[in-house]
């Protein structure tokens, strides 16, 4: 079966000023566990229909296609497999940072007309590990693993070669140049990214869907203007609204489509954001969040982590204005 072509639209600017309140009977523990919780999971309740109706969830999911995959050794120890995606809703290259060689993209592994085994290895559609002299993508002689395909060239998800067991950890992470690259103490984005990677590396499996939605969807330039407004006294929500943007302009339907492409229909979601649970599950619950794993700031549970008046104001606004599922630590 031929894969769908990706047609890139022209970008469209979104404006709005509406914020919403949504409370769930679910609070984070005082500490984020240092290991994956197994005895007392944070089970997300059913998201009410009116919440799904209120969120801008599309009737149909975007079309995504994984164009390349590569093994990345990391400075932290565990290897990752970086997947690059194209899609039909924007002109950006979004990423899936995957822990575990056996998490496989349907669109990456789909057989393509006139391709060779070398072509498949070059784009990352192989099993096992690459090594000098290897000639087959679909068979790894060192591990004796072989991929099988149906008559349409689609990968058969065999448990011996493809992850298909318990739901794995997932995080939907939006790009944050300031927090991840410029050492910003205005937000905890970089800290959450690192913590998600630590937990996934410890678990052996996981997926960070990395969406190119800088500044909660408003872009880096507008985000820098928002920072100036915050220095003038606005909080993170007020600053966006003053710039005629929504408090949160992101869409997570691309993440839903990417998770489905990777065969991750059930996940344990690392998040404090209740709206993200409904948004990632999608209007028709194509993905199911079976557990919420809280992301408690490091500074709230140790001497480490980000400490600044800016981060305290940022976290307070997330809790008080955006309904994030966190409890501030008691100050004695």
Swiss-Prot record:
Q: Which cofactor does it need?
A: Zn(2+)
Q: Where is the composition biased (Polar residues)?
A: 29-41
Q: Which UniProt keywords apply?
A: GTP-binding, Hydrolase, Metal-binding, Nucleotide-binding, Riboflavin biosynthesis, Zinc
Q: Which molecular function terms from Gene Ontology are attached?
A: GTP binding; GTP cyclohydrolase II activity; metal ion binding
Catalysed reactions, as listed in the record = GTP + 4 H2O = 2,5-diamino-6-hydroxy-4-(5-phosphoribosylamino)-pyrimidine + formate + 2 phosphate + 3 H(+)
Active site: which residues? 248 (proton acceptor), 250 (nucleophile)
Per the entry, what this protein does is: Catalyzes the conversion of GTP to 2,5-diamino-6-ribosylamino-4(3H)-pyrimidinone 5'-phosphate (DARP), formate and pyrophosphate.
The identity of this protein, by name, is GTP cyclohydrolase-2
Q: Which organism is it from?
A: Meyerozyma guilliermondii (strain ATCC 6260 / CBS 566 / DSM 6381 / JCM 1539 / NBRC 10279 / NRRL Y-324)
